[in-house]
């Protein structure tokens, strides 16, 4: 990709470099891809972000690099050929949905909601979903290293978009974790705790380790 031609193998393998160079908006994608993509793709993505997107953009370099892989060592040519391949790429479809991807002729399911799994409705304390008698889900944080365009936890995860205001965790992390542990101590029937988020890859190791030790 044009903007990363001079990146070293050491930089590429560095998790902090990957985080620092995530694609977060259309302008950054344009800088990265250069003339590989036609203008119509950028316009399509920009319209989706303004009118339909439920997730903000956050795509790390490694994920961008998996889109439109070379076939027998040959990449599609810049412009129309690469743009068509980019539109058709399954990872692009999942990570960077555009306006033309969305089927407006198919209505949403009648029971479709922002929180389709009703996790928030079943919070025992903030961030702890107790749906089944012996199992709970601990949502430790509302962020991920990358944002999938069709996240099933979109009500909580990521930044708000022009048409979608996200649910915000009100408590401080240390207070939320303490409340979760207190509830679990008072609920001995729970045997299975799924520690999730967001993605715990974004959680400082000492905080995750401290929670698991107490758990």
Where are these regions (language model features)?
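Flexible, acidic/Gly-rich N-terminal and inter-domain linker regions that tether
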Residues: 1-130
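Conserved Radical SAM active-site core
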Residues: 104-139, 150-215
